Curated annotation (Swiss-Prot):
GO terms for cellular component: cytoplasm. InterPro entries: Dehydroquinate_synthase, DHQ_synth_AroB, DHQ_synth_fam, DHQS/DOIS_N, DHQS_C. This is 3-dehydroquinate synthase. Belongs to the sugar phosphate cyclases superfamily. Dehydroquinate synthase family. It comes from the Bacteria. Its EC number is 4.2.3.4. It catalyses: 7-phospho-2-dehydro-3-deoxy-D-arabino-heptonate = 3-dehydroquinate + phosphate. Keywords: Amino-acid biosynthesis, Aromatic amino acid biosynthesis, Cobalt, Cytoplasm, Lyase, Metal-binding, NAD, Nucleotide-binding, Zinc.
Length: 365
């Protein structure tokens, strides 16, 4: 087992990474203050791991809350089901909410924990690669709104993050690839040597090689922890973690939540960010193409939806959380391994990026 730390002073917490951690209650016990535990999961993950985790937490009074699966259910109605369960079972302020699932479950369970009786303890047990390397770390919680993704939520840090890498053995290949989009992101924004490692190990990762996955998760979580420790509430450097997300969120919102997986939309959005970075003269064509090939090798879509026009993108990006004083700030690459958040670009370059023929770009690789 490996242990990392998210350093937030008195609110610091550990990230445990290893095999078989779901069967080690001693890891979670120090982070559970009361006798009541609510395990929030979904209809896909619960049959696989809920009984196992409940057994490990047998010393506590465990309430299972099983929600419908998918991004389409990341809304007020589903969030209400968590509150219904907690109130019906009379859970008090010393309860601990445990999120068992992917990013949607983690975001909703965390938001519920932030709100219930004005805040109760919260533990993340992510079971997808995307949630293990990204959404479980850093305290972003929330739900979607019809007009924009993750527009309603709170910063609320967990007490601990427990990553059992064996849960990836039941992860569909499409979901694994979606998680790899976020892994690749770290190489692009802050760890150039990691890009070369990913190029050398991508097939091992897709084949679920345990050592490769553990290393990718460790390096990703270490990068995320460092950024969150420096900028918890995304007032500066943390926003660079959103490479590809502004374009990607527009895709998710326009196509309908869940039609494109989050990681798939981020991958296509990252290609657009690479293209715009190249048009600004910050990276060259070979570097753009290198990023696109790596995303392709991960089994990810690298062309935005053909039905989305530049006007569609602009409509959805206008409500992006990085908009300040009416100016859309974008996360772009100053160079490979270094990202910046900027509104220093011309409308012409943005329009050219939105209008680019990505099918032709990919075809010439």
């Amino acid at each position: 087992m490996q242990t990392l730390k998210v350093d937030l002073g008195e609110r610091s917490y550990p990230i445990y990474i290893g095999e078989g951690l779901l069967d080690q209650p001693e890891l979670l016990a120090p982070h559970i203050a009361g006798r009541q535990v609510a395990i929030v999961s979904n209809e896909t993950v619960a049959p696989l791991y809920l009984e196992r985790l409940s057994k490990a937490l047998g010393a506590y009074s465990v309430l299972p809350v099983v929600l419908p699966d998918g991004e389409a259910h990341k809304n007020w109605e589903t969030l209400q089901l968590i509150f219904d369960g907690l109130l019906t079972a009379r859970h008090d302020r010393r309860t601990t909410v445990v999120a068992l699932g992917g990013g949607v479950i983690g975001d909703m369970a965390g938001f519920a924990a932030a709100c219930y009786q004005r805040g109760v303890d919260f533990i993340q047990v992510p079971t997808t690669l995307l949630s293990q390397v990204d959404s479980s770390v850093g305290g972003k919680t929330g739900i979607n709104h019809p007009l924009g993704k993750n527009m309603v939520g709170a910063f609320y840090q967990p007490n601990a993050v427990l990553i059992d890498t064996t849960s990836l053995k039941t992860l569909p290949a499409r979901e694994l690839s979606a998680g790899l989009a976020e892994v690749i992101k770290y190489g692009l924004i802050c760890d150039k040597p990691f890009l070369a490692w990913l190029e050398d190990n991508m097939q091992a990762l897709r084949a679920l090689d345990s050592a490769a996955l553990t290393e990718a998760i460790r390096r990703s979580c270490a990068a995320k922890a460092a950024v969150v420790g420096a900028d918890e509430r995304e007032s500066g450097v943390r926003a660079t973690l959103n490479l590809g997300h502004t374009f990607g969120h527009a895709i998710e919102t326009h196509m309908g939540y869940g039609v494109w997986l989050h990681g798939e939309a981020v991958a296509a959005g990252t290609v657009m960010a690479l293209e715009m970075s190249m048009r600004l003269g910050w990276i060259d064509q070979a570097e753009r193409d290198r990023g696109i090939r790596l995303l392709q090798d991960a089994g990810l879509p690298v062309v935005p939806p053909q039905e989305m026009t530049p006007a569609h993108f602009m409509e959805h990006m206008a409500v992006d959380k990085k908009v300040l004083d009416g100016r859309l700030r974008l996360v772009l690459l100053r160079q490979m391994g270094e990202a910046v958040v900027t509104d220093d670009y011309s409308k012409e370059i943005l329009q050219a990026t939105l209008s680019a023929d990505y099918r032709a770009i990919v075809a010439q690789l």
